[in-house]
Amino acid sequence: MPLVFFARVADVSLGTFRTIVIFRGHKFLASFIGFFEIIIWLVASAQVLTNLDQWYLALAYASGFSVGNYAGISIENRFAIGNELIRCISFNRDVLAGKLREEGFKVVSFDGDMGEAYPVELLLVIEKRRNVPSLIQLIKDLDPTAVYSVSDVKSVYEGPDIFPRRSLLHSTLMLLGKR
């Protein structure tokens, strides 16, 4: 019974992770994961199907499926594969973009308004998912009135290197919450 449960947790976790990786455009990694996913699934399914008189194996199989979905999503969140687009509206014009650039983020900014009385700055930042929490925290710290949204980006073409790059040490410190 534990074999069926844990095999099912493993194969569904891999399947969930594989599906998310496919969505992010990593075909080779998804194929590699799928190979191991199906082997584990065959072992778990064979145990249940050859012992249909043991109802608790079906229960372990179903429970493993449920836990595997949660585990797969958690694993993918931990790896934080891919990029995200952060759109930010700042009411403190010409402040936030400069500070974010000083911290090493690649920022595109536009001046705008929300009516005559509300000049704003619209910021666009494409950032690796693992760095987004520190970027959001920085936005909140620098401009608590800022409005932002975050969306997935399937692929990014970086083009010419016109933005300064952050060092690995700087990125690591940002991830740990130290600036």
Swiss-Prot record:
Protein's name according to its UniProt entry: UPF0316 protein Ping_1367
What the entry lists under PANTHER family is as follows: UPF0316 PROTEIN YEBE
**How does the record classify its membrane topology?**
Multi-pass membrane protein
TM annotation in the entry: 28-48, 55-75
Please state which protein family the record places this protein in. Answer: Belongs to the UPF0316 family.
Q: Name one GO cellular component term.
A: plasma membrane
Subcellular location as annotated: Cell membrane
Please report the organism this UniProt entry assigns to the protein: Psychromonas ingrahamii (strain DSM 17664 / CCUG 51855 / 37)
Matching HAMAP family: UPF0316
Q: Which UniProt keywords apply?
A: Cell membrane, Membrane, Transmembrane, Transmembrane helix
